[in-house]
Amino acid sequence: MNIIKYFRLQNGRVPFDEWLRVLRDPRAKTKIVQRIDQLALNNPGDHKPCRQGVWEMRIDEGPGYRIYYAHEGKDTYLLLLGGDKRKQQADIDQAVAWWKERQESENEI
């Protein structure tokens, strides 16, 4: 089983968790949680690479929900951000920036 982690900003906020908490559609929330469970089992389903190490999981529900994540080591996934098709490019840009920030902070001594 893989490890699922959540990206945390320097101020302590967890963007993915905040996004999921404000979703009003209970069916969509259920599908999103199921997909995270699948990811833990190394079965992400409908997904594709975006750029610079960030991947997108697509959930066919509502406005086309997305989960942006990256691989941290062999068996760890870092959930960066959630969003939907309407803001896809801006969400990808933000996820890439946060992933880059995470990698840079990991390399600091």
Which residues fall in each region the model found?
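Beta-strand-connecting loop/turn residues
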Residues: 12, 52-53, 74-75
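A short, surface-exposed loop/turn module that caps and links secondary-structure elements
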Residues: 34-59, 106-109
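Acidic, low-complexity intrinsically disordered regions
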Residues: 15, 51, 94-95
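Enriched for short, Lys/Arg-rich terminal
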Residues: 1-9, 26-29, 44, 59-66, ...
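Short, solvent-exposed recognition patches
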Residues: 11-47
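A residue-identity detector for tryptophan
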Residues: 19, 55, 98-99
